[in-house]
């Protein structure tokens, strides 16, 4: 009877991890060997694990990553110029602490999006908020936001997310609203939150794609300063796997 009351109380307090742990442990024959502090400590730890897992699930759902990539699963055998030491550096929290940008360039199919998603997955596991957006969808969203009056709110949301991933940026020349929006996003995040950008276009061509020289200078100065520049090469991994 007391156990049922305890379980009801734990659920009423929304301590669902503790409730499940309590149920599981009292069903184990050796649970009687645990002291009260030991038993309580174990179910408290299980509650923390439950909440951590729930938060991770929510972070990954909100991140909208298109593929479940992991840094641990990166294939270094494929000849694409990927530096293992650089990935090891990105496997620490240092680049988050210093708000460093990661710029991934290379032809289609060499794993830019996979690596970007792996960084997003890594960030979520550390407890950071993440958002993945393809560049065309980003600019479409901002255009709609201007029409419905939520433009500033959308920019603020993009500024606050702790890791923003912009995939397939600079595929086509930017128009005036697009480059101004991009400048606002990069400026808001500079020295505040890290950003990951992927592009098929080499960095040396970004200036001309942005268009306006003054805006291009401002954007590239912030992107290139103190950032990781990873240029992938070689044939498409998708082709070699066929």
Explain the meaning of each model-derived region:
Residues 1, 5, 13, 17, ...:
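Charged, alpha-helix-enriched surfaces in structured cytosolic catalytic cores
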Residues 8, 24-28, 102-105, 205-206:
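Short hinge/gating elements
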Residues 11, 16-67:
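Interdomain "pre-motor" coupling segment immediately N-terminal to P-loop NTPase/helicase cores
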């Amino acid at each position: 009877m007391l156990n049922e009351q305890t379980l009801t109380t734990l659920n009423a307090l929304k301590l669902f991890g503790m409730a499940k742990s309590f149920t599981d442990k009292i069903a184990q024959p050796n649970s009687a060997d645990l002291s009260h502090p030991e038993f309580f400590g174990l179910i408290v730890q299980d509650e923390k694990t439950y909440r951590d897992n729930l938060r991770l699930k929510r972070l990954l759902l909100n991140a909208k990553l298109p593929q479940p990539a992991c840094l641990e699963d990166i294939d270094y055998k494929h000849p694409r110029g990927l530096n293992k030491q650089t990935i090891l550096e990105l496997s620490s929290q240092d680049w988050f602490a210093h708000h460093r940008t990661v710029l991934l360039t290379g032809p289609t199919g060499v794993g830019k999006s996979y690596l970007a998603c792996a960084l997003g997955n890594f960030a979520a596991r550390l407890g950071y908020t993440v958002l993945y957006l393809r560049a065309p969808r980003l600019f479409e969203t901002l255009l709609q936001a201007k029409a419905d009056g939520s433009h500033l709110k959308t920019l603020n949301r993009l500024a606050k997310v702790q890791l923003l991933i912009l995939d397939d940026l600079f595929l086509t020349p930017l128009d005036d609203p697009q480059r101004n929006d991009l400048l606002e996003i990069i400026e808001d995040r500079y020295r505040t939150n890290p950003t990951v950008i992927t592009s098929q276009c080499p960095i040396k061509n970004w200036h001309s794609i942005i268009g306006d020289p003054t805006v291009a200078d401002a954007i590239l100065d912030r992107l290139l300063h103190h950032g990781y520049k990873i240029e992938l090469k070689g044939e498409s991994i998708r082709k070699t796997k066929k």
